C-alpha cells in the first residue's frame, strides 16, 4: 500500500541537483537555486539528509591542505550526475554559467568526506550536462546529455570501469535511442531502461523543435545492443527532468515537464519489464505538487524526494518562465508499518500525545517539524 507519509519544508532549495542514498542517509550535491551568486566560482555544496531523524545538515567547505593551494573539490554546478560504488560517490559532468560544462571525474569518500580526482584513461566523454548515469557492479554507464564542444544532443554510451579507472566508448548494436538530454536511465538486472528526455526533430541539433518521446528504450549491457521493444497500449506523457528509480525489479517515474504541452507533472507510473506494460499508481496521502528537476533516492522501502521547481501559484505567473524553487521533502513509503499508520492518524486528527512513550513523541515531532537551512523563496525565469 503505497502512501506519502512525510512532508517537510526548509531543506536545501535546489533544482537540477544530484543525490545518492548511503545507508539511511541521502547525500545531495550542488544544483541551482534562484537568487544565488553563480558568477563567483565556489565549491560545490553537500547536504546530508538523515532518514531516521528527518533532519538536514550541510557539510562545511573544504579547506586547502596547503595554504594558498586550492583544494580538490568540484565547482558548483547543475545537470551533473552522481552514483555510489562501494563507499565512493562518483560525480561527473554538469555545468555552471561561468565555467561551462565539465568532464572531470570526481570521487567523494562517504566515510572521510574527502574529494579526489582519480587518474583515468581511455576515451573520456566530452563535457556535458543533462546526461544520465547508472551502475552495474563496478561499472558506471553514461548516456546522452548535451555536449558543450559539439553543441548538440548525444546518444552515445560511455562506461567507466572503476576497478581500472578506464573509460570506454561503447560501440552499440541495434537501433540506438534518440539523441536527448534530461532523460532517465535505470538499471534493472543487466538492462538499462531509458525513458523520456528532450529531443529534437533535427536529430542531434537543437532547433527548438522539441520532441518528448514516451516510449521506453532498453539497452542490454551483456550484448551491448539496443533492443527492439514491443509497443505498449498505455503510456505516460513524454517528459524531461523527471525522476526514475527501480524497486523490486520494476521501474517507477515521477513528475517532470513537457514544454510542448507546457505542463508540469506529479503523476507516478510503474513499468513492468516482464510484461512490458505501464500502470499509473495512485498512492494514498498528499504527495508533492507538479514539478521538475527534483531528486529521488531509495532508502529501504521508502523513496525520499526533494527539491525541484514548479510554476508560481501567483496569478499571472503560470507559464514556464515563472518558477518557484522548492526546499521541501516528501517520503513515499512502499510498505508503511502499522506504527507509521498510527502516527499518521495521531497527526491527522491532532490526538493527545501526552500518554505516548517518549520515543514515539520524538518521532512525531520529527515528522511535523520543518528544517531551517533553506534560502528565502525567489522566483526564477527559464
From Swiss-Prot:
<feature type="repeat" description="Kelch 3">
    <location>
        <begin position="139"/>
        <end position="189"/>
    </location>
</feature>
<dbReference type="GO" id="GO:0016567">
    <property type="term" value="P:protein ubiquitination"/>
</dbReference>
<dbReference type="GO" id="GO:0031462">
    <property type="term" value="C:Cul2-RING ubiquitin ligase complex"/>
</dbReference>
<comment type="pathway">
    <text>Protein modification; protein ubiquitination.</text>
</comment>
<feature type="repeat" description="Kelch 4">
    <location>
        <begin position="191"/>
        <end position="249"/>
    </location>
</feature>
<dbReference type="GO" id="GO:0003682">
    <property type="term" value="F:chromatin binding"/>
</dbReference>
<dbReference type="GO" id="GO:1990756">
    <property type="term" value="F:ubiquitin-like ligase-substrate adaptor activity"/>
</dbReference>
<dbReference type="GO" id="GO:0140627">
    <property type="term" value="P:ubiquitin-dependent protein catabolic process via the C-end degron rule pathway"/>
</dbReference>
<comment type="function">
    <text>Substrate-recognition component of a Cul2-RING (CRL2) E3 ubiquitin-protein ligase complex of the DesCEND (destruction via C-end degrons) pathway, which recognizes a C-degron located at the extreme C terminus of target proteins, leading to their ubiquitination and degradation. The C-degron recognized by the DesCEND pathway is usually a motif of less than ten residues and can be present in full-length proteins, truncated proteins or proteolytically cleaved forms.</text>
</comment>
<dbReference type="Pfam" id="PF24681">
    <property type="entry name" value="Kelch_KLHDC2_KLHL20_DRC7"/>
</dbReference>
<dbReference type="GO" id="GO:0005737">
    <property type="term" value="C:cytoplasm"/>
</dbReference>
<dbReference type="InterPro" id="IPR015915">
    <property type="entry name" value="Kelch-typ_b-propeller"/>
</dbReference>
<feature type="repeat" description="Kelch 1">
    <location>
        <begin position="25"/>
        <end position="77"/>
    </location>
</feature>
<keyword id="KW-0880">Kelch repeat</keyword>
<dbReference type="GO" id="GO:0043161">
    <property type="term" value="P:proteasome-mediated ubiquitin-dependent protein catabolic process"/>
</dbReference>
<keyword id="KW-0833">Ubl conjugation pathway</keyword>
<dbReference type="GO" id="GO:0000785">
    <property type="term" value="C:chromatin"/>
</dbReference>
<keyword id="KW-0963">Cytoplasm</keyword>
<protein>
    <recommendedName>
        <fullName>Kelch domain-containing protein 3</fullName>
    </recommendedName>
</protein>
<dbReference type="Pfam" id="PF13964">
    <property type="entry name" value="Kelch_6"/>
</dbReference>
<keyword id="KW-0469">Meiosis</keyword>
<dbReference type="InterPro" id="IPR052637">
    <property type="entry name" value="KLHDC3-like"/>
</dbReference>
<feature type="repeat" description="Kelch 2">
    <location>
        <begin position="88"/>
        <end position="138"/>
    </location>
</feature>
<keyword id="KW-0677">Repeat</keyword>
<comment type="subunit">
    <text>Component of a CRL2(KLHDC3) complex, also named ECS(KLHDC3) complex, composed of CUL2, Elongin BC (ELOB and ELOC), RBX1 and substrate-specific adapter KLHDC3. May form oligomers as a KLHDC3-ELOB-ELOC complex; this interaction is likely autoinhibitory for the E3 ligase complex.</text>
</comment>
<feature type="repeat" description="Kelch 5">
    <location>
        <begin position="251"/>
        <end position="301"/>
    </location>
</feature>
<dbReference type="GO" id="GO:0051321">
    <property type="term" value="P:meiotic cell cycle"/>
</dbReference>
